[in-house]
Amino acid sequence: MRNIFTLLLSIIFTSVVTSQDVNDNIRFIPQSQVPQHVLDRQETLFPTNFVSEWRVQEMDGMQDAPNLRYIAKFEDDGRPGFSASYLPSGVLIFNSEFMPSEIIPAEVRLKIDRDYKDYTIRHADFITFYNPKREIYMVKLLKDIGVQYVFYNTAGNEIPKDSLPLEIKI
């Protein structure tokens, strides 16, 4: 009986471990592997912020420089939840800020309440893109056990997923 229980437990554990969703295109890296252009730009744009981690993202699975993005996760005045994404040359692609549901602007919250009546707003990320300049709220919604992300501009208009910048789709 004990052997059967152990075997059953190991099968369950193995299936849980092997079924985890892993993004092989993003990995943690030490600051020493971040290009100096990226480090300098981060220091210039966010001089008082503490970078807690660096990640590198390989676009399309390619590891050559034009296909890499460097992502800094940092704190602003002790508040975590900020990130910035850079090209290897130091060009800022976008930065984002975590927002609890309570501080999402009223025009966005009201539209979500109207469009997604059965959902609860969990939080949002306020994302600023720089080429071309766009500001987007990526809002996480919950319904029972389901999760859905919706996207709104600063005027409170929903953005169709097919018109989002490529960087947000990856």
Predicted feature residues:
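Bacterial Sec-dependent N-terminal signal peptides
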Residues: 1-25
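Outer-membrane beta-barrel domain signature
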Residues: 28-29, 61, 99
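Sec/Tat-exported extracytoplasmic proteins
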Residues: 45-50, 116-119
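A short, surface-exposed beta-strand/turn
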Residues: 80-94, 148-163
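Long, charged/polar, surface-exposed segments that mediate recognition or autoinhibition
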Residues: 83-122
